[in-house]
Structure formats: structure tokens, C-alpha cells
Amino acid sequence: MGSSPPPYYADLGKKANDVFGKGYHFGVFKLDLKTKSESGVEFTSGITSNQESGKVFGSLSSKFAVKDYGLTFTEKWNTDNTLATDITIQDKIAAGLKVTLEGTFAPQTGSKTGKLKSSFANETVAINTNVDLDLAGPIVDVAAVLKYQGWLAGAHTQFDSQKAKFAKNNFAFGYQTGDFNLHTNVDNGKDFGGSIYQKVSDKLDCGVSMKWSAGSADTLFGVGAKFALDADASLHAKINNKSLIGLGYQQKLRPGVTLTLSAAIDGQNFNAGGHKVGVALELEP
């Protein structure tokens, strides 16, 4: 049995990012529903109400797979009245290769977009490309990650053909094992970041994150943790050097029903208010 492939560039540091991101829904009420028809069509719908702006956003998508041909068709719609279609073929052109054609259309404005995405991964390398199909000139994204004995090295570049210049030049280095991840990155030579993930025990996951920019004294540093109370409940907590505190509680009420409660507290201005709470309910078969 071969080793697992390296992560794609966008997924570097994902385990640490999940410690800081999953289990929190500050300032919103959210409902997600997933169902599957007898014919195999998967439906996903969601609605989010922003407490501050009062805006309600909803989305609906359907996904159908033709497994014999490696094809997946996805249709999407949202309350901004944007329609989207994705067609994906995987492992048929070549083993490990996935190609997706995406298109969006906004009827009220007539705006159309198209993207051609591809990704390939084996035990040593993970490569993905993203071409924005703009008639005025495509924007091309290319990223690659190499893996050697747990060590990771990645690069991401974006070329804007309309302006005939590179818009992004990013690099990342890291190391990962099953229960430990180290990630560092440099974006455009001026923005720096790093994260550490450690699975301390079967119940406790911890993360550390740091970001700063050249020429700026403003550094963002945070620590976070997830603790599993049991198989169906978990606690989440995080804090950064600006005294912003995040707390979350996630409970599986019954199979297919998960409730998440979260709160964001401004520790520097505790008495001034402005704290945020959030509630999310996920339903799936």
C-alpha cells in the first residue's frame, strides 16, 4: 500500500485552519440540509441570516454522478440569482487526474463566467491549475506541492494575461505526520504566515497560528483547541493577541442532526458590547 499523496497548495495547513475555523458561526443563524434521492441525486440547501446586516442568503445545489464514466454534474442556485453548472471527469483521462469545467450566469445582469480547473496527485506531487476563461484574456493559476518523507514544499503563481504580469508569487514549506503538521508560507515576498497542528490525544486537538507583513508591526498570533467530550459532543476555543475570544459547542442531537452554538467575545472591550453569537443546525441522512 502506497503512501498518501501530498495536499494541494490550498490545503496546506488545513488541520490547523480547521481548529480555528470549524465549529464557529459568529453573528449568523444558519441551517444546512442534505438529502439524497433514490436515483442517487444529492441535494444540498442552506440558508444563512446575518444578525448585523439582516441579510438572508440561501443556496440550493444538486449533484449527480455517472460512476461508469467518472462524470459528476452539479447545478447550483443562490438568492443572489446566480446560476452555476459544474461538469467533472475524474480518473478517466488518466489515473489521479481530475478536470472540471465551471460556468456561472447571472440573468439579471447578463454576467457570465467560465473556469477550467484541473488537478493531479500521486504519492510525490500534487498539482492544480485554474484558468479563468475571460475573452479579454485568461487569468491562469498554477500551484504544486512536492512531498518527501513527510517534508512539503509548494509554490503558487498567478499570471494575468490582460496585464501581462504575475499577480501572485507564493511559496510554502512544511512537515506533516499523522498527528503533527507544521506549515509556513510567504506570499508575494511580503506577507508571512505559519501554523502548527498537534493531535495531543484522541480527544484533544491543538493549533497555533501566526501572520505578519513586512514593514508592519501588526502581528496576529492565535492559539486554538478542540476537545471531544464524547463521540457526539465537542468544545471549541480560540484566542488571539488582540484578546478576541471564540467559543463553540457542537452536539450531535441524533444521527444526521448536528447543532452548533458559538460566541465571539471582544476581551479588550468587554463592557462595550459588540460580542457575537451564532447558531447552526445541520441536517443530513
Per-segment meaning from a language model:
Residues 183, 195-197, 203-265, 269-271:
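Outer membrane beta-barrel transmembrane domains
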Residues 60, 64-68, 223-225, 259, ...:
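Outer-membrane beta-barrel "beta-signal"
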Residues 145-228:
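Detector for outer-membrane/organellar transmembrane beta-barrel domains
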Residues 60, 85-87, 116-118, 142, ...:
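Membrane-embedded beta-strands of outer-membrane beta-barrel proteins
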Residues 27, 54-58, 79-83, 110-114, ...:
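Residues that define the transmembrane beta-barrel architecture of outer-membrane proteins
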